[in-house]
Amino acid sequence: MFKTAGLQALGLTAVIVTTSSAQTIAGAANEFLRRSSVSIAVTQTRPIGTLGENIGLGYGVSGTYLFSVDSQGIFSLRADMAGAQYGNESKRSAFSETVGDRVQVRTRTSNYIFPMTIGPQLAWPTGPVRPYVNAGVGAQAFVTESDVEGVDDRLVIARSTNLSDAAFAWVVGGGITVPIVRRATRVQLDMSAQYISGGRARYLAPGSIVDLDGGQVRITSLESTTHLVMLRLGARVGF
């Protein structure tokens, strides 16, 4: 009888411990989600200095993840990643010398920049307009790719990376969020500007790749510091 009672007590204890652990894990997960938010925005990059002399404006999208260290959302950890295209060229040509002009393809060359940073953010989390400032460190990459695609269906037949490079970067910036619905503060309009100070990197600009006779190409890379201003307009959503 004592053995049976002991087993029952042990089983009950195991159930209580398991339930308590599950509740603790669920509570921690809910708290993590409650303190998390993401922002998706359309982005414009405005190169400055030597970079601005070599390339033009870029357009793309950016994503931001925020984790609030305190319960009010005053101090947060922020991670940003963006991708913008700052140049595009295309030309039509014969698929091959054997086929001739009966089958044509389009060669498209695109230039991209990818800033990635992480750091702290300070915000005023209440009111109709909520300002914030942020800083961070990271890197930004420059990539130029060429695709061969069908003229009509845009099906990519082949792809090649002409040049890729990256440099250390640091960022400072600020912006505002505005609740879109007065009582639904988990969805907010997000507008910001960031200054990104990038180190020296190699990159290509429109016109850097020249086709030569005999199927050869000449690639002239550029190199400079990579400073730019990034403007963002999007929406922030809390969980």
Model-predicted regions and their roles:
Residues 36, 59, 75, 114-116, ...:
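Hydrophobic core residues within well-ordered beta-strands of beta-rich domains
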Residues 104-111, 120-128:
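Helix-adjacent hinge/juxtasegments
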Residues 24-35, 69-76, 125-130, 180-189:
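Short loop/turn motifs that connect adjacent beta-strands in outer-membrane beta-barrel proteins
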Residues 40-44, 61-67, 83, 116-124, ...:
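Residues on the lipid-exposed face of transmembrane beta-strands in outer-membrane beta-barrel proteins
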